[in-house]
């Protein structure tokens, strides 16, 4: 199994974690090629999560923008309301096969926390979620859901109290307790094998999209668009299309208050190659080599780096990465609500916002597929506060 994507990825970890990661890699490789494991995973995708998720032709959105046809991949309709459950079920099934009794996870927007707590409840495992204090304030609804599902929440006070800090604390805990504990990492980040493992559990998004668009349109789309924090929903959509070279692939990062202000989460716009959370990738660093704090109105996008496979796709020119500001994302959130009766997550609203810029400049026979990675119930309070400022 490849440990790197070009010069990105790898395993930049302490000695204590090396053997744990080797054991994880061996088990993942063993079970992802095991028919019984695959059968069980697909059973839960279909009968618990509710897959395949719909590919929906957004007729009014298309008409109002006046350009390319827009399809939405409806990951918001999954059980728990986002794409995160695809990966959580896969990793916890693996944890059970490995004989682990407990799971830990980090969360930003709370969606991965809810998905992990849900899967832990389903399979009867003890669950602890690390969440930044700032994110707990922003995501009260998801915090309460996790507690209802039986998870213990560990507030993280260090740093800015956001996603990066939650990952730091979760990794520290894992070093101490890896004998009986499995770390369910929520995005396509971290040391090998996590970026590959998360992609493998999320690529169902792109595989379904391929089948669905061929059935509906008789051809593949021209453009794929997805939001990118760490980038698991995006790599899940993109991966099955990478070899289809005529398809444009666009990842949308958090522009926050504007890249020029320094308050954003757009690593590609303002980053350099460095090491974070056990991987080499593109990260936001200051001149002294310290990781900058990321900012976004969206709790799931304020990560100061990107998954290493995204860094590689950008490096070889196979995908391009753009940014959308808070203001643009909120406008897109409102626009989709008003035009399609769909309340998107703030993360997904970044992808919708870029689609709103791009689609009117494309011919009407062109096709865009946007990954609607999650639903926006969790964000309604944040939006309300933002609009009433």
Curated annotation (Swiss-Prot):
The record ties this protein, via PROSITE patterns, to: TRP_SYNTHASE_BETA
One short Pfam name that applies is PALP
Record bears the keyword Zinc: no
UniProt EC number: 4.2.1.20
Reaction catalysed? (1S,2R)-1-C-(indol-3-yl)glycerol 3-phosphate + L-serine = D-glyceraldehyde 3-phosphate + L-tryptophan + H2O
Where does the record place the modification N6-(pyridoxal phosphate)lysine? 84
Purpose of the protein: The beta subunit is responsible for the synthesis of L-tryptophan from indole and L-serine.
Keyword line:
Amino-acid biosynthesis, Aromatic amino acid biosynthesis, Lyase, Pyridoxal phosphate, Tryptophan biosynthesis
Q: Is Membrane found in the keyword set? A: no
Q: What is the lineage of its organism?
A: Bacteria, Bacillati, Bacillota, Clostridia, Eubacteriales
Name the family the entry cites.
Belongs to the TrpB family.
Enzyme's top EC category? lyase
Q: What organism is listed for this UniProt entry?
A: Clostridium novyi (strain NT)
Q: In which pathway does it act?
A: Amino-acid biosynthesis; L-tryptophan biosynthesis; L-tryptophan from chorismate: step 5/5
Q: Which cofactor does it need?
A: pyridoxal 5'-phosphate
Q: What is this protein called?
A: Tryptophan synthase beta chain
Its assembly, as annotated, is: Tetramer of two alpha and two beta chains.
A GO cellular component annotation in the UniProt record: cytoplasm
The record's annotation in InterPro entries points to:
Trp_synth_b_CS, Trp_synth_beta, Trp_synth_beta/beta-like, TrpB-like_PALP, TrpB-like_PALP_sf
Entry's Gene Ontology molecular function annotations: tryptophan synthase activity
